[in-house]
From Swiss-Prot:
Gene: TRIML2
Reactions that this protein is recorded to catalyse: S-ubiquitinyl-[E2 ubiquitin-conjugating enzyme]-L-cysteine + [acceptor protein]-L-lysine = [E2 ubiquitin-conjugating enzyme]-L-cysteine + N(6)-ubiquitinyl-[acceptor protein]-L-lysine
Domain B30.2/SPRY: 231-429
Any Pfam family matching the protein: PRY
Protein name according to UniProt: Probable E3 ubiquitin-protein ligase TRIML2
Zinc fingers (B box-type) by residue: 14-55
């Protein structure tokens, strides 16, 4: 044991403390028992096999350790603050996303109900010659009512699932926010203690040094990571309207608007990058989707649907271009003039983006065929995963100006030649009565 003789002599270790047993200066420190020793204590059997060093050396060693933990604590505090801010931002973001997906589901339901009603009317018109057969007419009406009811039930279920996933996500984020907030408070308190410890004199610093060190380390071992939440885009809207078959358009590519890097097939349905025409300048990590071409067909009214095979492309875009096209290879490239779905692969990871605004979507597996639906009157554009028969994303209440033209684009690679290609698919006869020349 050690004892203080005079408060005025606390900073002079040779006069600061004396051994109560031997009344000699305590100039040594036992790291095992965490006490100061005099020379006679050091020679005793009790400390014979313990790690003992000079008291100044011990203090400096602990001071360095405390300083290292202090630096680590400051770094960990910044990381915890960042996670806390991110979780708070994500809480606001998922609320907005939930509302957006709710509007998207409601918009898709309204569109499908309109198409269903139109299909019902067409079926009744085709049975006009059998109008006297009331049983047949009643059967058609009952069938339409049943389909409309099933459609409403499906979309109500989707809204309920969306709400359930949204609540689960919010609970996870709130729990994560609470953990991050608690860690920020703990680290702030620890940093204050460590700063005080590093500034203390030799004896004060060594007091309970090992305990303070271990407690500090245990706080730093607490791992913090952001909450894992369910992507709302997983709430797929299943099924494709049977009316899409009627609205299917047989599109062709317009050579006059094709980028010089593109080679078009003879039937003007397939586009691929020319060999040896890639622009190698610039950042090799940059994605340049300027290898663009418009469809020869344009739309000013009505509803239209087409499908694109993207299986042989690793970086592609499909969508709608609204505006005028200039000379060959110089179609307007302002992003604000296009509504796009973008697909890209990095290694084994596939990513989908929609624009505008730029938003990333969750993709469970590679997309092979994209369906595009356009309703000019209602300002709606929908993208579909044809293979999975599900909605990818839709835009509603778009303010279109002028003629609308389907747009297709491939990414110009920097370096090696890309084998990427896109093909416009055709299924059966087309109904192009509402297609403008």
């Amino acid at each position: 044991m050690s004892k203080r003789l005079s408060p005025q002599l606390q900073h002079n270790i040779t006069e600061d403390a004396y051994c109560e047993t031997h009344l000699e200066p305590t100039r040594l420190f036992c790291d095992v028992d965490q006490i100061t020793l005099c020379s006679k204590c050091f020679q005793s059997q009790e400390h014979k096999h313990h790690m003992v060093c000079g008291i100044q050396e011990a203090a400096e060693n602990y001071r360095k350790l405390f300083q290292e933990i202090l630096n680590t604590s400051r770094e960990k505090l910044e990381a915890a603050k960042s996670i806390l801010t991110d979780e708070q931002e994500r809480m606001a973001m998922i609320q907005e996303e939930e509302q957006n997906f709710k509007k998207m589901i409601e918009s898709e339901y309204s569109m499908r109900l309109r198409l269903l009603n139109e299909e019902c009317e067409q079926n009744l018109q085709r049975q006009q010659e059998c109008i006297s057969d009331l049983n047949l007419r009643e059967t058609l009406l009952n069938q339409a009512i049943k389909l409309a009811t099933e459609l409403e039930e499906m979309f109500q279920e989707m809204l309920q699932r969306l709400g359930r996933v949204g609540r689960e996500n919010m609970e996870k984020l709130k729990e994560s926010e609470a953990r991050a907030s608690e860690q920020v408070r703990s680290l702030l308190k620890l940093i204050v203690e460590l700063e005080k410890k590093c500034g203390e004199g030799t004896l004060a610093l060594l007091k309970n040094a090992k305990y303070s060190l271990e407690r500090s380390k245990s706080l730093l071992l607490e791992h913090l990571e952001p909450a894992h939440i369910t992507d709302l885009s997983l709430c797929h809207i299943r099924g494709l309207s049977s009316m899409f078959r009627v609205l299917q358009r047989h599109l062709t590519l317009d050579p006059e608007t094709a980028h010089p890097c593109l080679a078009l097939s003879e039937d003007l349905r397939t586009m691929r990058l020319r060999h040896g025409q890639q622009d190698g300048a610039g950042n090799p990590e940059r994605l340049d989707f300027s290898a663009m071409v418009l469809a020869a067909e344009s739309f000013t009214s009505g509803r239209h649907y087409w499908e694109v095979d993207v299986e042989k492309a690793t970086r592609w875009q499909v969508g709608i271009y609204h505006g005028s096209a200039d000379a060959k290879g110089s179609t307007a490239r302002a992003s604000g003039e296009k509504v796009l779905l973008t697909g890209s692969v990095m290694g084994t990871e596939w990513t989908l983006w929609v624009f505008p605004p730029l938003k990333r979507l969750f993709l469970e597996k590679k997309l092979d065929t994209v369906g595009v639906f356009l309703d000019c009157e209602h300002g709606q554009i929908s993208f579909y995963n044809v293979t999975e028969m599900s909605l990818i994303y839709n835009f509603s209440h778009c303010a279109f100006q002028g003629a609308l033209r389907p747009v297709f684009s491939l990414c110009i690679p920097n370096g090696d030649t890309s084998p990427d290609s896109l093909t416009i698919l055709q299924h059966g006869p087309s109904c192009d009565a509402t297609v403008s020349p």
